[in-house]
């Protein structure tokens, strides 16, 4: 199973967030080809500003693997991680992050900040932007509805 497959699983999570009126971002963590956690943005539901999809996916993966480090794991997420999530990925020692839309306003990987390329950090997370039109479309649709007060 390739990147596109995993990004589409993450996209299904993003759609679940959309249905709940959350900013539609979904994330999954994969280890050796197996999905070990899935999450979607739950800031509204949990009343928690840090409940981004990536944070929830990291926590769930650590619980499942009973470890604080996610070495050898990859995170697939529908939107470029923000600064908080990028640094959480560094702390988790995850191997790589793959994202399918850019966040021009808050991106922590390449669009605004470059947290993962920071040479002073003691763990280097590899990253890849793998564009998926559906991922950006879902976000545009959400913000359009928000502007028109449909959500
Ligand atoms: Zn985030």
UniProtKB/Swiss-Prot annotation:
The record places domain CMP/dCMP-type deaminase at 1-111
Note on cofactor: Binds 1 zinc ion per subunit.
Q: What positions constitute the catalytic site? A: 54 (proton donor)
The record's Pfam families line, in alphabetical order, gives: MafB19-deam
List of residues binding Zn(2+): 52, 82, 85
Asked whether the UniProt record includes Lipid biosynthesis among its keywords, one would answer: no
Q: Which GO terms describe its molecular function?
A: tRNA-specific adenosine-34 deaminase activity; zinc ion binding
Reading the lineage from the top rank, the first entry is Bacteria
Q: Any idea which UniProt keywords this protein has?
A: Hydrolase, Metal-binding, tRNA processing, Zinc
Its catalytic activity?
Answer: adenosine(34) in tRNA + H2O + H(+) = inosine(34) in tRNA + NH4(+)
Q: Which cofactor does it need?
A: Zn(2+)
Q: Name one GO biological process term.
A: tRNA wobble adenosine to inosine editing
Note the subunit structure: Homodimer.
PANTHER family assigned to the protein according to its UniProt record, in alphabetical order: CYTOSINE DEAMINASE FAMILY MEMBER (PTHR11079), TRNA-SPECIFIC ADENOSINE DEAMINASE (PTHR11079:SF202)
Member of which family?
Belongs to the cytidine and deoxycytidylate deaminase family.
Q: What does this protein do?
A: Catalyzes the deamination of adenosine to inosine at the wobble position 34 of tRNA(Arg2).
Q: What name does this protein carry? A: tRNA-specific adenosine deaminase
Q: Which gene encodes it?
A: tadA
């Amino acid at each position: 199973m390739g990147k596109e497959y995993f990004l589409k699983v993450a996209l299904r999570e993003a759609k679940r967030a959309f249905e709940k009126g959350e900013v539609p971002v979904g994330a999954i963590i994969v280890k050796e080809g197996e999905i070990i956690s899935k999450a979607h943005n739950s800031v509204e539901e949990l009343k928690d500003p840090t409940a981004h999809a990536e944070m929830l996916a990291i926590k769930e993966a650590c619980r499942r693997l009973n470890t604080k480090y996610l070495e050898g794991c990859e995170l697939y997420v529908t939107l470029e991680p923000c600064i908080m999530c990028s640094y959480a990925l560094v702390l988790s020692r995850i191997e790589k992050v793959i994202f399918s839309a850019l966040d021009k306003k808050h991106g922590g990987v390449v669009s605004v900040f470059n947290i993962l390329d920071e040479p002073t950090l003691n763990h280097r997370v590899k990253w890849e932007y793998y564009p998926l039109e559906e991922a950006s479309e879902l976000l545009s649709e959400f913000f359009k509805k928000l502007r028109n007060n449909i959500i």
